Design a protein with these regions (language model features):
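C-terminal motif of bacterial Sec signal peptides marking the signal peptidase cleavage site
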Residues: 16-17
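Sec-dependent signal peptide recognition
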Residues: 2-9
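Short, low-complexity N-terminal intrinsically disordered segments enriched in polar/charged residues
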Residues: 22-49, 53, 61, 68
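Repetitive helical segments and hydrophobic/amphipathic motifs
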Residues: 11-13
Length: 192
């Protein structure tokens, strides 16, 4: 009788250890990835909300100052002045002063139309914003892509009028390592 009890106990321990072993083989990263994605979602919503309001103080946490990127100077200063500032870091003070030149109202309006849930689930979302009048208008298109460690926002604005027009393209790149949103790069180009 005692041997049967011991064998039953050992069998139970064996079964429990197999169950624990199966659970140990499951990737733990899934919970971490979900946690990172939730955290990233909160940050994106906060970033977009701050952008929509045009509040540099609400989005500056996503930037490391001084920003080492001459394109910020190019987007904010006349060509002659831009040359003077090449190679100089773009500080928090300049970020406050030139915020509206770097992140124009049209960009902020279009960014507000991005669906964060769709972006994080599908890796892509697109929003458009346009205005037409009797003498011209504009059309803005913002395409946002999300990969494992990067969010790229490509903003294309086309301005047209009876006297001509032009096209501006701005690309903002953010890293998302470990679910933390941080600015990485900015590029711009203008075509007339």
């Amino acid at each position: 009788m005692r041997i049967k009890t011991i064998l039953a106990g050992l069998s139970l321990l064996f079964v429990l250890s197999c169950v624990n072993q199966q659970n140990a083989n499951k990737p733990v990263k899934t919970k971490i990835e979900k946690s990172h994605k939730r955290h990233l979602r909160k940050q994106l919503v906060s970033f977009i909300k701050g952008m929509r309001k045009g509040k540099p103080d609400e989005v500056k946490a996503y930037f490391d100052f001084p920003i080492k990127n001459d394109n910020f100077w190019y987007a904010t200063l006349d060509y002659e002045k831009w040359e003077e500032y090449k190679g100089k870091g773009f500080g928090e003070k300049e970020f406050q002063i030139y915020f509206d030149a770097i992140f124009m109202g049209d960009f902020r309006e279009t960014l507000g139309r991005i669906n964060v849930n769709r972006l994080l689930k599908q890796g892509y979302d697109k929003a458009e914003y346009s205005y037409d009048s009797w003498n011209g208008g504009f059309k803005d298109i913002l395409e946002v892509t999300y990969t494992d460690d990067k969010i790229t926002m490509t903003f294309n604005t086309v301005v047209y009028s009876s006297g001509g027009g032009g096209e501006h393209i701005y690309v903002y790149v953010f890293t998302t390592k470990d679910g933390v949103l941080k600015f990485k790069d900015f590029q711009s180009t203008m075509v007339y």
